[in-house]
A protein has these predicted regions:
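Fe-S ferredoxin-like electron-transfer domains
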Residues: 3-6, 66-121, 200
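A short acidic Gly-Thr/Ser loop motif
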Residues: 33, 53-56, 75, 122-128, ...
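Short glycine-rich, Thr/Ser-proximal phosphate-binding strand/loop in the N-terminal lobe
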Residues: 133-171, 305-312
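Local cysteine-cluster metal-coordination motifs and their immediate loop/turn environment
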Residues: 46-78
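Gly/Thr-rich phosphate-binding beta-strand-loop-beta motif of the actin/hexokinase/Hsp70
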Residues: 114-151, 281-298, 435
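Short, contiguous acidic and Ser/Thr-rich linear segments
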Residues: 24-34
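Eukaryote-biased recognition of intrinsically disordered, low-complexity regulatory segments
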Residues: 15-26
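Helical "lid/coupling" subdomains associated with nucleotide-phosphate turnover
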Residues: 160-169, 176, 180-187, 211-215, ...
Length: 511
């Protein structure tokens, strides 16, 4: 579906109607018969369509003529005014900062043709995309930009996107993510008073699915167990080959994948940390739709991924939403009642991942949920926002995946959980969650609560380090080879641990 400027023009083949997205301050033309969701996507919006537009998740609700409908199931058959509930200024919280670690400026050979070159790093996450602009003469960070990953329209998790690509071809997924990268780089260059044509190197990270979809590599082996990537090696390519509108001879590098869905983003985290050189047993956790875990020290690293699912991103939770204005992001208990903090200090319209963890931890503390996850009755934080039994079960599935992954890696390593000296939490969700809540619900073993440190967007930080220092890029190859990958999907022992971790800790475990 192609959008045009608003005119009275009518298509010779199909009638076109004017669609006004009132709260987005956006108007477009859409062909008759397309869905409102397709019109949103074509207009450059990033609606929540976690089920891929199949009418199952209920997250794409909009209001038309005073009636709430699903955008994915509503056909364009007339001029429409649509209310999405997302004002243009309301944007999701997307973390760009890391721990502040930097690499010595030593970029190696750069393409010639500009006296003031720019470098870039891009972290393609399942939920969001973050880009960094760096001075190509000294490595100074000039700016960061982020947007929601437009691939969310094809599914909330990596397996559903790989399956979509398998059944429908991957061109749409590849095209929309490349376009997103172009938008970010163009805005970054403009913000620095420069041209995108000055960007001579881009270093990219993302999980194996994001890697394959960006590069146009078939995802059939990632759609089904044992989830094997077709390419794991680091890539040194030309940006022009992938329609990235920068310097005509710009380099496009991808850090290597490790195995399964443990991809270049995890390697970026390793580049930005010291797991391969430290003596202390360290656990690196990137909690998201697909949780990636690395355990080890200078004597060796072991890695796995766990299908935590999209509950932490707001999918499959009745009142769930991403971390944007109106989301309950933190919950505490005072005088036997729950107290909620809402992003934007406004009326609560939903609950995001960090609020979900806090909310469950508080309900456990109040005795509203027992160890099995049984909820006394639907619990309302506000008139509009609540958790029900189904929501608690979805949380149990997600938290059990992370907890079972940690236990499984410890068993493979031959250590006890208590032997872990440090826990490094990477990623946006890890930055906003309360470690006490994560431990109270048993997502992270309670005995590790005081050993938890958030390291922010370490994946993006590692990509920046590789962009400004050629040796760090080469180091990423060594790190990927050093990390032993464990496929938990085929491990019967993992399945048993997973079932055990479905329960919440007893009171004695998290006092």
């Amino acid at each position: 579906m192609k959008l045009t400027d608003i005119t009275e023009q009518k298509s010779e083949d199909k009638m076109k109607y004017k669609i006004t997205f009132e709260d987005e301050q956006l108007t477009c033309l859409a062909e008759a018969g397309t869905t409102v969701l397709e019109a949103q996507i074509a207009a450059g919006m990033t609606p929540d369509a976690f089920c891929g537009g199949n009418g199952k998740c209920g997250k794409c609700k909009v209001v038309i003529n005073g009636k709430e409908v699903l955008a994915c199931k509503t056909a364009v058959d007339r001029d429409m005014t649509v209310y999405t509930g997302n004002k243009k200024e309301d944007r999701a919280q997307i973390l760009a900062q890391g721990s502040g670690r930097q690499a010595e400026f030593s970029p190696g050979n750069l393409p010639e043709g500009t006296d003031t070159p720019l470098l870039s790093a891009v972290d393609i996450g399942s939920t969001s995309v973050v880009a960094y602009l760096l001075d190509g003469t000294n490595g100074e960070l000039l700016g960061t930009k982020s947007i929601l990953n437009p691939q969310r329209q094809f599914g909330a998790d990596v397996v559903s996107r790989c399956s979509y690509a398998l059944n429908n071809g991957g061109e749409a997924l590849s095209g929309c993510i490349r376009n997103a990268v172009n938008i970010l780089l163009r805005e970054l260059a403009k913000g620095a008073g420069r041209n995108p044509e000055d960007i001579v190197r881009i270093v990219m990270v993302g999980n194996s699915c994001m890697h394959h979809l960006f590069l146009g590599i078939p995802t059939d082996t990632l759609a089904l167990a044992p989830y094997t990537p077709k390419v794991t090696e680091a890539q040194e390519l030309m940006a022009a080959r992938y329609d990235i509108h920068v310097h005509p001879r710009a380099q496009l590098w991808w850090l290597p994948n490790i195995g399964g869905f443990v991809g270049a983003d995890t390697v970026g985290c390793l580049v930005a940390s010291d797991l391969d050189t430290c003596e202390e047993m360290t656990l690196l956790v990137d909690i998201g739709t697909n949780g990636e875990l690395v355990l080890g020290n200078r004597d060796g690293l072991i890695a796995c991924s766990t299908a935590a699912g999209p509950a932490f991103e707001g999918a499959k939770i009745t009142c769930g939403m991403r971390g944007s204005k109106g989301a309950i992001d933190h919950v505490t208990v005072k005088d036997g009642e729950t107290i909620c903090h809402v992003i934007g200090e406004t009326e609560a319209v939903g609950i995001c991942g960090s609020g979900l963890l806090d909310g469950a931890a508080c309900l456990l503390k109040l005795g509203k949920i027992d160890e099995t996850g049984r909820l006394e009755k639907e619990y309302h934080f506000t008139d509009r926002v609540f958790l029900n039994q189904k929501d608690i079960r979805e949380l149990q599935l997600a938290k059990a995946a992370i907890a079972a992954g940690i236990r499984s890696l410890c068993e493979k390593k031959g250590i006890k959980v208590s032997d872990i000296s440090r826990v490094l939490i990477a990623g946006a969700f890890g930055n906003y969650l309360d470690p006490a809540s994560a431990c109270a619900i048993g997502m992270i073993p309670p005995e590790l609560q005081t050993r938890i440190t958030s390291i922010g967007n370490a994946a993006g930080e590692g990509a920046c380090m590789a962009a400004v220092n050629r040796e760090q890029f080469e180091r990423s190859r060594i790190l990927a080879q050093k990390a032993e990958f464990v496929e938990l999907a085929l491990d019967m022992g993992f399945q048993e641990i997973y079932v055990e971790e479905m329960e919440f800790p007893g009171e004695s475990e998290h006092e």
